[in-house]
Structure formats: structure tokens, C-alpha cells
Amino acid sequence: MADTPEVIRVAADILTKRYGGKQELVDVERLDGSGVAEVYRARVVNNPFFQHRSVVVKRSPASGDELVDAAFLRETVAYQFATSLSPSARPGPVLLGYDTAQRVLIISDLGDGRTLADALRAADEATHTDILRKLGRALGMMHAGTADEEDAFNVLLQRMTRSRPNSANLQKLRDCLLSHRIRIGVNVIEGAGVAIPAEVRIAASNVQSRLLRGGMRAFTPFDLTPDNIVETDSAFHFLDYEWAGYRDVTFDVAFVVARFPAFLAAQPFNAQATEAFVDAWVREVRDVWPSVQHPDTLQARITAALIGWAMSSVALLDPLSLSELAEHDEQLRADFVAAGVDVPLPDLGGALEAGVSGPDSAHDVLRPHSQGPFTADEALVRRDLRETFESLAAFADAGADPAYRTIYEFAQALAERLR
């Protein structure tokens, strides 16, 4: 890891080249970052050429994995795009400078606001409802404000990738992986011996296609983990754009309804808070997508997206990397090959099926609770999955069509299995 003065020196040089004068960054503070990223806050020495008093500097060291490293370009483009938006639609900080060769981003400092995770942990039931209502409004404003701007985002992405060999293909592959995870999750559940009703299977298949090509698309960071959402001055700001792009907006809604998959919820499913969240979101987007005002349509779309998140969460259980899974998964392998990513030929003599990797496999984690004991890690993972399936069951139970009853029973049975 580069030492702190070097990272900050690079950032100061970037700002100097862009804004003029001689920029100086002092009082450097290390912040929490995702993965191996280095994140710092620094105070800007007073300078007439640059009005910001402090900045956040993020460096994402190259890992050597081309799929992982492609996230930096996506994040840079997403910040470029977000910065170009009007303040009412802008989801988070503005981009102040960047250097793709040194993998450094400089963004505006939001200050010392609290994360959504902290807010939810401290909330009583009434406050919980109010927080989700505000979150629904913030998401809706972002979705409504960016629904017609997809071409602008794509232009920025094309500019960033066209001079970099195979970069565009890697970005397309990263998008495809999101829908592959839904399919892989279905396979993992079946491999664990759980029957999947036709209603669930059809919804999973449909939502797989809709994620990237649905008619209700808008810009989203996609990673809405509560640690990546900051509240300042009663407004929510979304951080971490490594998976940002144009996706079906109901996936964002479902992520919150599901109580943030891959994040242990502070509270049980709260029907009142969920309704307040969805209603606030609908009020912001109904002029853009009038169909969300029809309860049956809204119920169907959110339920399907919940199924998508549940299956994706199950897929993440697998200890194999996606490259390793691609060795034995023909559909995944085809997309890797199309993107120019090398995948080793499968070991036909002893290869395990995708998703099966020995005693610690995803299938094993999904075993019935009567077949315990479970390790501490298994218990945490099972709790997170249980929360997701409980949320799916609770939301599906409100649907009027008989198919929702089938979905409810499936989700409830899986939640019980994971106790």
C-alpha cells in the first residue's frame, strides 16, 4: 500500500492540474473503505482557485483480477455522471478530480453525517418508519431525476472504455454477472434438495431479464448497503458506485424491503415502515412510471425483484469465484469467453458441479436447522438469508393472486429451514 503522504500528494497534483494554483492537502484522516480501497479525508489549504474546504481521496489498488479492477472505471464514470446531474437528482458527492492510471478519485466531503446503518441501529419503531420514508423519497428523486439520462451515462462509459483494450467487454460482463447470480442461486437451492415452485422459478427467470433491460430503468449505485448511505442535513447521500449503472428500479426498492441483503438487519420486518418507504418512493416516480400507482402491478414487480435478491444472496454463499464457477457452468462460461476473459477448461474427470465445493459448500450452509450445529460464520450467513426470505414471505403474503400464497409458503419454508 502506498504511504499516506504519497496518495495525498497525488491527489494534490490532480487538483492543481485541474483547478490551477498550488493545491495543498493537510490534516489527513484515514476513513473506512470498502475492500482494499484506501480512503482519506484531507483539509484543503485556503486557495482562491478551489472553494472546497475539505475533500475525500480514494485510491483503489490494482488487484490483478481484471474483473475486480474494472470496478474502478465504472465508479469513475458513475461519479462523472452523478456530478453532471442537477442537485435535486444527484445521489451523492461530486467528482472533483481523478487519475485512472494511478486509480485515484477525489470527491467532495459530505462531512460527519451518520450512516443509515447507525441510524437504523438507534431507531425505535416510529423513527424506523420515518427513516425509511425519507429513504424512499431520496431513492425516488434519484430514479425520477435520471430516468431519461441513460444515453448520457452510456456516452461517458464509452468514452472511458474505448481507448482501453477489452474494457467495454469487461463492463458488459460485470453487468451480466448480476443476472447470472439469480440463476445460480436457483441452482444452489435445488442442489440443497429444496423444491422450487413454478411460480418462483418463472418470476426468477423473468426478473433475470428485466434487471438490465426492463422498461423502468434509472441510475442506481445498486449497492445500497446501509454503510454506503450517509445522512447529512436530513438528506440521504449514496456512496460506492463500483456497481452503478442503469438497472430496473424495483430492484432498489426490493433491496430495502428485503432489509438489505448481505447486511444483518437491526429490526425485524416492519410492515408499516415498508409501506411508508414504498409509498414515498411511488410519490416521487409516479409521473415517470404511472403503472406504479396500480397496486397489483407494484406488488408483482417488487415481489419478483425480492425473489431476484433472495436468489442472488444464495448465490453469494458459494466459496468458488465466478471464474471458477464458469469452468463448469456453460452459460457463465459463454459470457466470459465473449468478454475475452480466459476460463480454464473444466476438469471433466473430477469436476464438481457449479456451486458444489466440498463440506463448506453453499448447499451445506442451506441444510435444515435440525442438522446443526453451525459454525459462527454459518450462523451469521443463515441469519442474513433468513431475514431476506422472511421479508419475501411477508411481502408476498399481501398479494391477492393465489400465486403469492405459493411464493409465501416457499419463502416461509426456507426461512424456517434457516433458523
Positions of the model-derived regions?
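Active-site catalytic-loop/activation-segment of kinase and kinase-like phosphoryl-transfer enzymes
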Residues: 1-8, 155-208, 285, 385-406
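Conserved short submotifs of the Hanks-type protein kinase catalytic core
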Residues: 102-114
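Conserved kinase catalytic-core helix
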Residues: 113-156, 204, 210
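Catalytic-loop of the protein kinase fold
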Residues: 219-221, 226
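Catalytic activation segment of kinase domains across protein kinase-like and atypical kinase folds
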Residues: 227-259
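Active-site activation/catalytic loop segments of kinase-like enzymes and analogous catalytic loops
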Residues: 251-290, 305-327
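ATP/Mg2+ or Mg2+-diphosphate-binding catalytic cores
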Residues: 308-419
